[in-house]
Structures are given as structure tokens and as C-alpha cells.
Amino acid sequence: MLDFVGLGLFDEKDISLKGLEKIHNADKVYVEFYTSILMGTDLEKMEMLYKKKITVLSREDVEQHAEDWLVDAKDSNVVFLTGGDTMVSTTHVDLRLRAADMGIKTTLIHGASIASAICGLSGLQNYRFGKSVTIPHPYVSNRGVRVVSQTPYDTIKNNIEAGLHTAVFLDIDKDKGYMTVNQAMEILLEVEGKLGEGVMVDRLAVGIARAGSPSPVVKADYIEALRDYYLGGPLHIVVIPAELHFVEAEALVKLAGAPEGILENID
């Protein structure tokens, strides 16, 4: 048996009682921190609360050598822990499919997800979100050219044209660290400067930091202003809204400090 258990958003206490029960009954417990990380805890605190030894898996362990440890689930109870909800990442869906191919039964214990948290924190309506996207850190190519991905810009543009909000995840890089809202705004404006399509001009954005923690920060403002706003430590995420419903606009003003001018000319 392989149980996928979502840990929630921030620390070791976010796990559900069902998830905790699965861990207590497990023969082996694994966790991966590369698709998402709980900023409010560490492995030692998790093992202390869960009263179980936890083995950390690398990206290679999960994506390239999963069969090496999945085989344990053929004749014992194995728990695989992930930040957030357990099936939001395509990587975890693929892992479940590989387990199925090996004849291993799987169960899911869901956890709080950033996808729902950003709606609750900002007041934006969850059914109005389109395709999400990740802004990667720029890098220098082998030819010495700075490469900035245009994909986030295009995704946001397409969603806006369809009347849909965009959840923009920010890159986590072992060398460059956690991307901030400020860096993300700078990148979007840089691409705007190159393309000149006006997508990011006078565009409202919502920056969210440390969702699920005791002290989350939510700030809505125009991209140029949000670029200079300090939201504190990681993890950060951005939402680029499309045309707002009145209740959404009111929520952004009252809950996220958006400029009151966004309430004008909204039905």
C-alpha cells in the first residue's frame, strides 16, 4: 500500500488527523521537498511530532529511481509526504501511475493547497482562474546571452483575454534561492519592455507571502508599485487578475490594500 499524504501549507501541524494516522501505521515514510517546502518547519520537528523516522527523497529519487523504493509498498505500508495537496504536482500523478503499473494500491489523503489558499486570502473567486504558470529565474546561456522566459507573459495575456485570473508560481532554485514577488514583477516588466504589447501596463497584481502561516501578507497594487513593496520572507506567489467582479474588487481593496480606484466602473 502506498499512501500519498498532503502536509498542507506551512508547518508540521498542518497535517490532517487522517494523514497523521497513516504515518503512525506506516512501515516506511518518505518525503520530498523539491516541488514544495514547508517554510515553518524542518525534518526534525516533523519526526518529533509524527513519532516516525522520515526519509527525504531527492528529485532523482522520485523522478528517475522511484521503483527502487516503491517496491517496498508491494508488501508493506509506505507513506509518501508532500507539501500542499498531494496531487497538485504532475510529478506526483506520474508517481501514482507508476505505482499502479507495479500493482501497488494507492490512497490519497489531501492537504490544504495554495490553489485554494490564494482565493481565501485575496477574495478572488476560485472558478475564475485559468491556466497557472511558473516564472523561472533568468539564466545565462552557453553563448553568454541572458535568457528570460516569455511563457509567463503569454500565459497571463491569454488568460486575461479569456477573462480569467492567473496564479503565478515563483521559481525555487537551489543556487538562486526563492524568487520574490519583487523579482517576478521586475521580470514581467522586462518582458513587457521587449514585447511592448501593453499587457503589464497599469496592470493590477496580487502578491502573497507565507500563505498558511500565522502572519501571511497579501498586497494588491499595480505591477510597477508592487515591484517595490516588501512582503517579507518566502514563500511568495503572485496572482494577476483579469477583469474583476465587484465583490472581488472590494475584497482586494479591503483585504489586500488595493487602490480604491479599482472600484470605479465595475459592475
UniProtKB/Swiss-Prot annotation:
Query: What is the name of the protein in this document?
Result: Diphthine synthase
Instruction: Recall the taxonomic lineage recorded for the source organism.
Output: Archaea, Methanobacteriati, Methanobacteriota, Stenosarchaea group, Methanomicrobia
The GO molecular function terms of this record are: diphthine synthase activity
**PANTHER family from the entry?**
DIPHTHINE METHYL ESTER SYNTHASE, DIPHTHINE SYNTHASE
The record ties this protein, via InterPro entries, to: 4pyrrol_Mease, 4pyrrol_Methylase_sf, 4pyrrole_Mease_sub1, 4pyrrole_Mease_sub2, Dphthn_synthase
* SUPFAM superfamilies in the record: Tetrapyrrole methylase (SSF53790)
Function noted in UniProt: S-adenosyl-L-methionine-dependent methyltransferase that catalyzes the trimethylation of the amino group of the modified target histidine residue in translation elongation factor 2 (EF-2), to form an intermediate called diphthine. The three successive methylation reactions represent the second step of diphthamide biosynthesis.
As for family, the record states: Belongs to the diphthine synthase family.
Alphabetical keyword list: Methyltransferase, S-adenosyl-L-methionine, Transferase
Entry keyword annotation includes Ribonucleoprotein: no
GO biological process terms held by the UniProt record = methylation; protein histidyl modification to diphthamide
The superkingdom listed in its UniProt entry is Archaea
Gene3D superfamilies attached to this UniProt entry: Cobalt-precorrin-4 Transmethylase, Domain 1, Methyltransferase, Cobalt-precorrin-4 Transmethylase, Domain 2
**How would you summarize the oligomeric state and partners of this protein?**
Homodimer.
Q: Where does S-adenosyl-L-methionine bind?
A: L9, D85, V88, S113, I114, L170, A211, H236
Pfam families per the record? TP_methylase
Organism of origin:
Methanococcoides burtonii (strain DSM 6242 / NBRC 107633 / OCM 468 / ACE-M)
Q: Which reaction does it catalyse?
A: 2-[(3S)-amino-3-carboxypropyl]-L-histidyl-[translation elongation factor 2] + 3 S-adenosyl-L-methionine = diphthine-[translation elongation factor 2] + 3 S-adenosyl-L-homocysteine + 3 H(+)
Enzyme Commission (EC) number: 2.1.1.98
Record has rRNA-binding as a keyword: no
The metabolic or biological pathway listed in the UniProt record of this protein is: Protein modification; peptidyl-diphthamide biosynthesis
